[in-house]
Each structure stands twice: as structure tokens, then as C-alpha cells.
């Protein structure tokens, strides 16, 4: 896609291809603490070269469109679960699926200093959700890397007293959402497993009052193509997709990511990376002209 750069006023400005926010650029072997988000870790797994060029060299890749409808469904689901959180009752979908022993986790209230240096009270679940400045945080071992991620929700298993990682997903597919097929033959659905594992890994490192469950869930809402038409409303199916948490592999992969950014050598690209393939072909044409 073509992405045109605008300033905060919505006016078109020159795109340099470089990140002007120097604090977002990592210097190999720097001593100062540096935050790496769950999405950046996902980029490392997808293509180490693109990840390195963004984080260390400061290249700014074209942006992706914001999916406002997906954001809206997330917001509405959070409102539903927050109402259940206040009274510590299971959500209607949990009751429907025979999971009455699970309730939205009430982590309490904390105080946060905002950008205006004002102290404000926040629900802790909202701190964990706010990925830009807060979120779940864990400093990786004895390094300067702070791992970070904004989670959609956390539930509590009242029987085992364990916390459950939850992420909301919105889609529109003619196929029925099913536990048996959801993770089959889909690269990006498979990446959701890593997302859940990563959140659980962070929570384990945060030493919370409860242990972290090996059970996690995707709350998938799927827009339905109904015969009667639009009529100013969209109907959704709702499905809980279960994932058994695995975090043992993350120590090695995170350390590999840190070793990569502490090296002066730019890593090889993923051979399936379309961004790298486009960059190579564009470079040839820009340098030599049309070679076909």
C-alpha cells in the first residue's frame, strides 16, 4: 500500500524514511534501559532484518491502516467485562460455555503520574491494557531490555486461583469459527499463540499475587453475512478459542533478539518477507533503471 506522511494537523509533509524520535532507536550494547513491545518481538520472529533496520538503524516503514471497527469491538467487549469485574460475576459467554468459575480479574487501583505531572487513580487492568506508556512490563534477566505489552483482559479461575490471559479478536469470515480449525493453515492465527504466550511470560515475571494459568483464551467475534442485509447493524458470532500456554521457548528467542540488536551485523531477511523483496527490486530499478 502507499502511505503518505502527514503532520499532526493532517497536512502532507516530506517523508524521510527515518525515525526522528531518537529515543526509539537502539544503540548496540547501550547501557540505558530500552523497551521492546510484544509487536516488535513479533516483527523479529517474522523478519530479523526488518526488525533490525527499524530498531537499530531507525528506518521507518510504511504504516498500516487502523482498523477502527476492530478497535470498537474491543472497546465494547471491555465495557461488558468491566461491568462483570465490578460485581465479580462471570460474563454471559463464560456461563454459556460452562466456565462459571471464571470471572474478570479485579487487580485493584493504582496511582499514575500523567504527562501533565498530575497524579491520577487508574484501574490496574487499564494500566495493563495501555500499551503506549504502560502495559505489562518485565525486565529481561540482567539486561537493559524491558519487555512490554498491552493485554486486552485478564480473568481469574476462582477454583485454582490462577490468572488467565485473554485477547479479543475481530474478523469477518464466511467460515464458522471452530476450536478444531482456528489455528490450522493460517500464519497470522498461529502468531496469536505467540502473543498469548508472550503476555503470560510477562505476567510470570511480574510476580503477581496469583499464579499464571496454562489456559488462555481468544475471544473471537466474527461478523456474519446475513440474508436480510445491513440495516445499520452487523451481527457477530462469539467463540472462545482455547490455547495451552507455553513459555519455555521464549527465553531463548528473546535472548536471540537481544543478541541481534547488540550486533553491528545486519541479519539476513526472511526469504518470505515481501517488504525485503520489494526493497531489493526497488533498489535495482532506482539504481539501474527498468532492467526488464
Language-model features: locations:
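Metal-dependent nuclease catalytic regions and adjoining charged, substrate-binding loops involved
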Residues: 2-19, 27-29, 36, 202-292
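Metal-dependent nuclease catalytic cores that hydrolyze phosphodiester bonds in DNA/RNA
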Residues: 1-159, 288
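Short amphipathic alpha-helical segments and their helix-coil junctions
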Residues: 30-32, 61, 173-180, 252-258
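Serine-centered coil/turn micro-motif
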Residues: 64, 186-190, 272-276
